[in-house]
């Protein structure tokens, strides 16, 4: 994000979690069990609330262009399927390095372990953790099925992505170019 703010790169796509460190209002998306389905979530992110959050980004050197679907975060693990609350008990679950995720997975009875994403595959492979939570598309693209036996569609947290452009880049565009983008 700092490269985007500085104008070193023009565009990026990030999870709202990264934006929550700059504006705590983005952490609303990480509250557990807020949305029943993608339709509800999309109505919020694409509606006035989501647009209001994007409107706060220019003061941080960013312009939020739109939200992209990333979906609900789900749990994979190497021990057992998760069908009920008790199934979380004792599982070491890798979570993203945002305090609310530690709180959520502690409350569920698991042992949350914050691990940076680039270290996740190795941590699962070496059994440093039993499982992890992320969106289905990430589970697929990161090949986590190679090191995880069970996928449970827990849908605890909805995780939209935000398409960002550097404000420096945005300001160099003509109004016609901005409309196209």
Question: Residue ranges of each PLM-predicted region?
Answer:
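N-terminal secretory/targeting leader peptides
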Residues: 1-40, 49-180
């Amino acid at each position: 994000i700092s490269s985007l703010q500085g104008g070193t790169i023009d565009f990026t796509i990030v999870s709202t979690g990264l934006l929550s460190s700059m504006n705590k209002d983005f952490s609303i998306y990480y509250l557990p069990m807020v949305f029943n389905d993608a339709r509800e979530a999309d109505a919020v992110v694409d509606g006035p609330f989501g647009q209001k959050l994007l409107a706060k980004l220019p003061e941080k050197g960013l312009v939020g262009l739109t939200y992209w679907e990333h979906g609900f975060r789900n749990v994979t693990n190497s021990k057992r399927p998760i069908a009920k609350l008790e199934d979380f008990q004792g599982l070491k679950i890798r979570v993203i390095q945002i305090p609310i995720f530690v709180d959520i997975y502690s409350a569920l009875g698991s042992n949350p372990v914050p691990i940076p994403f680039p270290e996740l595959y190795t941590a699962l492979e070496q059994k440093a953790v039993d499982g992890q939570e992320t969106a289905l598309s990430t589970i697929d693209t990161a090949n986590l099925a190679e090191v995880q036996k069970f996928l449970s569609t827990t849908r605890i947290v909805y995780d939209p992505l935000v398409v960002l452009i550097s404000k420096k880049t945005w300001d160099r565009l003509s109004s016609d170019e901005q409309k196209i983008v």
